[in-house]
Amino acid sequence: MRILVVDDFASMRKIIKGLLKQIGFQNIEEADDGSTALEKLKIGEFDLVICDWNMPEVPGIEVLKAVRNDPRLKDLPFLMVTAEAKKDNVMEAVKAGVNQYIVKPFTAETLKKKIEKIFDEG
């Protein structure tokens, strides 16, 4: 499985990558902002996107909307990561087509459960 991790903080990308490796995923790419993520998604084949909500210029919700509006990417599993579990944000993400939502900080076990839930539903 090829996973794209999108976060503007290198330390957070490193943490998520480390957690993914703990639960058995090795094929992980990174993007440091929403624009880079969209470029990588257009040229690459990914099985899952794990994307931070709060990023400058192109926030995670805009990445999600762009993915859902792209005929080639519209069914790509998408896990939104955020530091805040505001109900309005969760509802906006659900409306935009997010598969799962995870609040920082989280453990490898929580991440594993969210990923399993995405693929069990698919």
Protein language model regions, located:
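Two-component/phosphorelay signaling modules centered on CheY-like receiver
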Residues: 10-29
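Alpha4 helix (beta4-alpha4-beta5 surface) of REC/receiver domains from two-component response regulators
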Residues: 17, 62, 85-100
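Helix N-cap/capping motif at the beta->alpha junctions
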Residues: 30-39, 60
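Short amphipathic alpha-helix used as the core "switch/output" element in two-component signaling
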Residues: 39, 61-74
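Active-site beta3 strand of CheY-like receiver
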Residues: 44-50
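Receiver (REC) domain active-site loop signature in two-component systems and cognate sites
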Residues: 55
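C-terminal output helix
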Residues: 106-115
